[in-house]
């Protein structure tokens, strides 16, 4: 597409191999076309509002970034076998969100993983539950929690704790109604999965791409934004395999 002069919107990940990604980005740079990578969660109104609080300095210096991402049901083992694994398929969104929220690069990861949801995923060579610790170049720390199955729905939350305050984005629910009675508190479960949860974000990211092309402006999610989470994911895989922290620059 780049050689043909076509502007590109590419879903994540661009590829699973950093060499292939770097070669593709070189072609994009050479051709002068526009490339946007599909990290739609950046365009979620809630997460974007948290990022704006960080970028404006309202929270001071970021100290701790916490991201919770849990799917409502695990994928088939056949899908897992060809997806590149949990870190490259699922957590890659969270690695991007960590960069987006912090405004800095991840320098080190320490990943813990287990098979607690579906034994078939383990037989396919992957994990279904993970906790990943992050270190950022700007001194902040991060925690990502992942599970392939949350029985109550699609659990998508972020929190940034800074020197001047904290900003949180909670789950979206069908309604904001809360019932209080003698049995306790009742409220809606989170929206079931990504199509419902991120409907506005999908529309907003495509509009941003169209606007960038029409107005000849830089796209809001660059090729490097597509490469960086892949490097973090590969470092997380190495960390899980070796049982120790891994520098992202080693990938």
Per-segment meaning from a language model:
Residues 77-141, 147-152, 224:
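Rossmann-like dinucleotide-binding domain that binds NAD(P)(H)
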